[in-house]
Every structure is written in C-alpha cells, then in structure tokens.
Design a protein with these regions (language model features):
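Positively charged n-region of N-terminal signal peptides that target proteins for export
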Residues: 1-6
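Extracytoplasmic substrate-binding proteins
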Residues: 25, 35, 106, 116-194, ...
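Proline-aspartate-enriched helix->loop->beta-strand connector
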Residues: 88, 95-112, 127, 227-243
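Alpha-helical, coiled-coil/dimerization segments enriched in small aliphatic residues
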Residues: 74, 196-222
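A ligand-binding cleft/hinge motif common to bilobed small-molecule-binding domains
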Residues: 113-124, 240-263
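A short, structured surface patch at a secondary-structure boundary
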Residues: 44-102, 106-111, 214
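Bacterial N-terminal signal peptides
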Residues: 7-16
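Boundary at the C-terminal end of the N-terminal hydrophobic targeting segment
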Residues: 19-23
Length: 265
C-alpha cells in the first residue's frame, strides 16, 4: 500500500512539474522516423543504454546524466564518471517509479526496446522519449547529430569534430586494405559463441575493416551457434567482442576458447 501511495505522490509531483515547466521545445526525428518534441535546454537525461552514455561522454555532456541502468553501473572501469548515478533498473525493463523521481527532461532508449509501454508511462509525466539505437556504424553519425542537437551548441561542435576525426582514420584504413586479399572472419557478439550477423554493428565493422564475414547468410543480427558450426565455416580469424569494464570479460573469453579447443582436440 505504501508503495502505491509513493508512486501516486511521484506521479502527482511529476505531472505538476510538467504543467508548470512548459516552455521552449525543439522537434527532432528519432530512429523510428517519429517527430519527438524535446523541451530545451535539456538539463536532465536518463540513458537506458551504455552506448547512449558513451555518446554523451564524447559530447562532454556527462553533466546532464541523472540516471543510468544497472548494466552500465557494472562497467565502472569504462564509465567511472557515472558509476555513482542512480540506477533505473534494466535497460529493457526500467523502473518507471525511479525514473519519475529523477524527473528527466528526456529518456534515451533503443529503437524498439523497451516497448511502447515506455511512452505510455512517461509521456503523461512530461518526460520525452527519444529512441536512438546508437550502435550501427552506418546510422551512428546521424543519430549522434540528433542527440547533440538537443544537448546544445558545444555538444554539436564536439560531435562534428569527432566525426571528422573518424572520417580521416577511416579513409586511411580503407586505403591500406584496398589491395589486400580479404581474410575470412567470424565475430562473436559478447556472449560465448553468439555470432554477429548482418544488421549488427559488429558485423558491419568487420566489413568496414576489409574482412569477408562468413556469417553473411544467417539472415539475422546474431545467432547462437556451437563450436562445430564455427569450425565448419573455418574462418581465418575469430573476433571476440567484449564489454570494456565488465567483470566477467575474461571468463567469457576463456569459455569461448574452451569450446573451440574441445572440438579441435
């Protein structure tokens, strides 16, 4: 009963704040192609993805973050600046009560996760929901520019400088691999023997790096396989993707290595 009353009090406070805080806003297009109205200036942001936190850090607007997910909090080595921020729960299943208590101007979410319940719960409280994946290399520049546009001129300036730097290095890399034979590769998508497929950022990166990815026919962004499947494809290189700062990264690597060696032996 006390929890229900607490949530009701938060709801009333947030709705009152939303009513009194009406003011200037900007309209941006999110990854779903929707027009999203964002109050400006944006001072308080909750990010449901670690990639969102990373992009905000590139823009040097960590000061706007007021809440992150439990997953991001576990990556203290990668994100020491935000480790002390409140957790809003899991990225796919956030705690709406905690989010309402934090009173963000905007919540940053993936394109399709969490589902539409996010908008149903938060938009009546005056909290804008901005859906940007911020993971696919081909879409990342435009999505970062969209995010920077709500975080102010300095964020836009730093985003522009960042992509100019990326473009210079991309050009150099592409020149260096233009005449090289393409090595065959498979890439593991964080979890042991979960292979990255077309449409995933990791798959796209292997293509950009000049490799011939042997998972081009699986038809989905990632697929769980076994060690026999990997050895049948017989890649020259096997790329292990890890999460920086994650406590069990070494354990995941050991498990993958053991799976592959067990078949070879």
């Amino acid at each position: 009963m006390n929890r229900i009353l607490g949530w009701f009090a938060v709801l009333v406070l947030a709705m009152c704040s939303a009513t009194w805080a009406q003011g200037p806003e900007t309209v941006v297009t999110d990854s779903l192609g929707r027009s999203v109205h964002i109050p400006v200036p944006v001072r308080r942001v909750v990010s449901l993805s670690a990639s969102g936190v990373e992009c905000i850090r590139i823009m040097e607007r960590i000061d706007t973050l007021v809440g992150i997910t439990e997953h991001t909090k576990t990556r203290k080595a990668q994100f020491p600046e935000v480790a002390r921020l409140p957790s809003v729960g899991r990225g796919f299943m956030p705690n709406f009560e905690v989010i309402a208590e934090l009173r963000p101007d905007v919540i940053l979410a993936w394109k399709t996760n969490p589902g539409p319940e996010l908008e149903r719960q938060l938009e009546p409280l005056g909290i804008a929901v901005l859906r940007l994946d911020l993971t696919e290399p081909g879409k990342l520049p435009e999505e970062m520019r969209t995010l920077a546009s709500i975080l102010g001129p300095e964020a836009q300036k730093r985003t522009k400088a960042y992509w100019e730097w990326v473009a210079r290095w991309t050009e150099q890399i592409q020149k260096s691999i233009a005449v090289q034979p393409k090595p065959t590769v498979l890439a593991e998508h964080f979890t042991p023997l979960r292979i990255a497929g077309p449409g995933s950022g990791l798959y796209d990166l292997t293509q950009m790096a000049g490799a011939n990815n042997l998972a081009d026919d699986i038809g989905i962004r990632s697929m769980q396989v076994d060690s026999e499947w990997v050895l049948e494809r017989n890649p020259q290189f096997f790329v292990k993707s890890i999460l920086l700062g994650k406590r069990n990264a070494e354990e995941d690597t050991r498990r993958t290595d053991e799976c592959l060696r067990s078949v070879l032996e």
